[in-house]
Amino acid sequence: MAEYIHIDEQENCISITLDIEQDKIMAIGEKLNEINEEAYMNGYNWEALFHYYFEQNAPELLEDFDADSEAGMYAGYYYEVSDETKEKAHKFAKMIEALIEDEEKLYQFVRDYGEEIEWD
């Protein structure tokens, strides 16, 4: 897993966090903001982007999932810990990592759907 994304398994939840203050993530956020001026990429807008992306591409990963981001961090949670939610969390994180690593795909997604995303 890339250094900017973390999965933390607790007794009562599994969290997935994206450190948006890492240089790579900040640079991607600046480019996304150039593409769509509403996409100033704080934690809330990463949440909006990921929510829309997963609705379109893997809605099953949003079942039993909740996000609670802050300005400087994206955070999502599965509040039940089971083999199924552990698997979902790892798939979720891998999809985020794939988007970050394929920047052009991410930029094109925002070009194509940026007006439909409910930015903060």
Model-derived segments and spans:
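N-terminal, charge-rich interaction modules
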Residues: 1-26
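Aliphatic-rich, non-membrane protein domains
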Residues: 3, 21, 27-28, 98-109
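Surface-exposed, low-hydrophobicity interaction/linker segments
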Residues: 17-63
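Generic alpha-helix signal with a bias toward terminal, lower-confidence helices
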Residues: 28-30, 58, 77-79, 108, ...
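General N-terminal targeting signals
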Residues: 33-35, 91-95, 113
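Amphipathic protein-protein interaction modules
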Residues: 46-104
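Short proline/glycine- and acidic-rich turn/helix-capping motifs at secondary-structure junctions
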Residues: 48-52, 104-120
